[in-house]
């Protein structure tokens, strides 16, 4: 039987992508969550299971921005925090979302911030 609802399809894609994407201490995984209101992302070292840095749309300087600008700014903020933690390169885990729109803007913000994605 096929999976028909959009959230179920996203979860299947997420599991498939997650099986292939692994973060390490020197190259952590950037996990992205997209909701209707905003984006949340975190840098995860899968070897130790710890979050290195995080950024969320609920932070004061991004709350009032339009969605695409918000995603780009969050990418830049997370890149700054990653640099402060000594991270230069990351693995991008799109979380089952298509690489389009806000997810793409977030990834471009990471690159603008100086991270190698």
Label every model-predicted segment:
Residues 2-117:
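Ribosome large-subunit tunnel/peptidyl-transferase-proximal elements
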